[in-house]
Amino acid sequence: MIEALLAARPGRAALIIVLSVLLTAPAWRDATAEEYPSRTISLVVAYPAGGGVDTVGRVIAQKLSEALGQQVVVVNRPGGGSVIGTRDVAKAQPDGYTLLLMVTGAALPANPGYDIDKDFSAIGLVASVPVVIMSNPSLPAKSLAEVIALAKKEGAKLTVGTPPSPTLNYFAAEQFKAMTGTDITIVTYKGTGPLTNDLVGGHVMLAFNTLPPAIGNIQSGALRAIAVGSPSRVAALPDVPTIAESGLPELEIVQYYGLVAPAATPQPIVERLNAELRKILTSEDVKKRLMDAGGDAMPSTPAEYARNIQHEEGKWHAVIKKLGLVVN
């Protein structure tokens, strides 16, 4: 029939076919979105297992699995700060089956092999997690003022552990040195899990560490929280002052975790994932689990998360430039 139409009246037949395709295309797109997901989804965590990002990632993966009816599996791809895992997701197929739990600071490495503004589609914020200045309990300083006084006295003999450059923790430690005029020695670790273990063991005496991998040790007394980097105190540690309260109001250190997908991921899939993520983050169960881990749930729209990425990455780029730090 189509061949006959084309032979008889090619212009009209072509128009009919084109109109038919245009009219049915939305239905195809809707069907694709409705069928998603039809197989396992990989949630890439660009940090080692056992660390703070991994802890939050596993909470979200479990709940997304339940909501979507397909397994969401955490895949740890650490290396280069967060460069390796982040770059892998940037180059993945934009089909909704490879996601990334992105953390503030992903745009800070030099020449990472991806563009934070062009290579990702923001899905939504997940949580805010403060960086905490914490110590081995044998350190004689119990407040931030005492830590600063001790740092001025001990100088390079006082060691402070952080994850590697280019992470927020590392740059915050450098900012702390500059603001306080101290010369403490920064020791970098592959992740927050190994850092926490060495801090408990007394191999390093002070740390700029995220809360999730250390909160149990803080609550048991194996570690001491000196000050939290969030604007206000955290519910999990209500007696621990903020860094601002402790005398350094310009030193705010908060990591924002969020879900992103490769750029060009179909908008219906992004919207589906955002809708499920927001439901998850408003559930009392997840809010409590994140709070117990030292974070706060932060449901958002994709646009709100995109603005957060731009603001936070810009803020830390300015810190790096001001301090004259070299980023590898």
Ranges and model annotations:
Residues 1-9:
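N-terminal secretory signal peptides that target proteins for export/translocation
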Residues 11-27:
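Bacterial N-terminal signal peptides
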Residues 147, 151, 250, 256-284:
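Bilobed periplasmic-binding protein/Venus flytrap-like ligand-binding cleft at the lobe interface
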Residues 253-261, 291-298:
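A short small-residue
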Residues 38-40, 179, 242-245, 267-328:
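An extracytoplasmic/periplasmic, membrane-proximal ligand-sensing/linker region
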